[in-house]
């Protein structure tokens, strides 16, 4: 197999990440230096982000039979890299300062997880997808159990390891069934063969079970109902910095592949076979996730259930992906909001956990009256929560508005009713956190449990970074044409 120069350039984001991972491993082996490893990792992420502007000049392009890079892929690689870069920054200045040893391995796990995400996004082969998903799973287990001195972290890592192993088996079995009837592992070749296969009832049944197992395994990775059982426990056991990449990059990567597959399926009207399966998963996820989030007193568990509902909203796009241009636009806008909001929320928790050792960052009650002692962090937290709930003047409203418009075009009235009901329920869950922030301080509670003084917040850089994220959330919501033009730029030549 001959690889051309253009193909190497197209694969440069993946090659840069792999090279940086090798260099970091060598530094860890010969000379442990947390600061140098942090700089190398940050340099790698920045280099990948810059390389995207070079790659966009030659896309779309097939880089061997394993990878296909287009503008759609570049958009989500950019989101993944930004999420990983911010997780790297917050981990350096926040959580890793509390660890006694093994600082450097966190960055290595972060790199491996990002490599898995990028390889999945540009994958054009079921083998590439499987290897990438396994790389994500293995590095995620390390990220979950990195705070091994905490009981919840070990419990969460064991749960995720066992369930992830089971789902990997189902995924591999589904891939085997698809290969048995299509004779190919390439996405493009499989879709071509499907047009002939569906005429045979026997092959169609095998194909249906194979694709169904594939969707179920991906639903587990996306923590959708009813494959969500691990989500709240794993979220509660992970550090805030690890959650930045686990809750954004991993899910964006998995969803991007599913979306590309269903877009191609829609050309042959094969996606109608899986209409009911995807619709049921979507509706149950958005209702269940929001209902369970209401009674949570743990913010991480609440964000876990929130992720179930947020991805549940977006999952319905898979069955109406035949309206390709609008579906791509909706997906891009919605995932940009999802990434910004989650990074902002876990960033706040990361800053507070590092600045105040006695601060229970996971309890909602710990944030009681936070506004009166730290108005900036409270403001950022409020903006993030409002964006997740889809309130106007935030980018979250833009995402849900476009999603609703897409559903209305398809006349899916039942989904519209469930969408509105679940959004109202979700807003009540987010409002509980917001109301805690602005409660008037009381001597009997506030001063005994948490005393936050503005002079203690000495790391202005992280506070400024969080403020910038919240400004972006508002700016993109007030001026939606910027977000729309950005997303259109990536799908216009998809």
Swiss-Prot record:
> Chief location of this protein?
membrane
What Gene Ontology cellular component terms go with this record? plasma membrane
Q: Name one GO molecular function term.
A: NADH dehydrogenase (ubiquinone) activity
- Is-annotated flag, keyword Cell cycle? no
Catalytic activity reads:
a quinone + NADH + 5 H(+)(in) = a quinol + NAD(+) + 4 H(+)(out)
Q: What is its EC number?
A: 7.1.1.-
Q: Which UniProt keywords apply?
A: Cell membrane, Membrane, NAD, Quinone, Translocase, Transmembrane, Transmembrane helix, Transport, Ubiquinone
Q: Looking at its record, which EC class is this enzyme?
A: translocase
Q: Membrane-spanning residues where?
A: 8-28, 35-55, 74-94, 103-123, 129-149, 161-181, 205-225, 239-259, 273-295, 301-321, 332-352, 379-399, 414-434, 462-482
Where is it localised? Cell membrane
**Which processes are annotated in GO (biological process)?**
ATP synthesis coupled electron transport
Assembly description: NDH-1 is composed of 13 different subunits. Subunits NuoA, H, J, K, L, M, N constitute the membrane sector of the complex.
Function as written in the Swiss-Prot or TrEMBL entry = NDH-1 shuttles electrons from NADH, via FMN and iron-sulfur (Fe-S) centers, to quinones in the respiratory chain. The immediate electron acceptor for the enzyme in this species is believed to be ubiquinone. Couples the redox reaction to proton translocation (for every two electrons transferred, four hydrogen ions are translocated across the cytoplasmic membrane), and thus conserves the redox energy in a proton gradient.
* Entry similarity comment: Belongs to the complex I subunit 2 family.
Q: Name the chain's protein.
A: NADH-quinone oxidoreductase subunit N
Taxonomic source organism? Buchnera aphidicola subsp. Baizongia pistaciae (strain Bp)
Gene expressing this chain: nuoN
